[in-house]
């Protein structure tokens, strides 16, 4: 999977391997599908750990510090957002909170993006499409591994 992501987003494979590993740990910690976390990263930052938006969202999961200060304080403050592990863990924590609060993945994703009132759910559809591609890559990789065994 890391190879696929690295090629598609033109990021070094060893860097992506680290992101994938962190996403799996975050998924386990927050009971989230790691592919959903990876899909959010793809849509939010294209796997750029130093991405910053015009509204101040930062890092892989594009977290806006002013909305989550308590989560960031636990990791040393908002400057920690440029550390991939912190960014992914905090992003996963936020996503988990929204899933609990709203009860479904589509709404949680729309809220994560600040687009709850967007009628076509364009953001969540992008994330779901990316997740489907990652799932296909995972199936392909497993099938390849099984064939070579």
Region locations from a protein language model:
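Catalytic glycan-binding domains that act on GlcNAc-containing polysaccharides
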Residues: 1-149
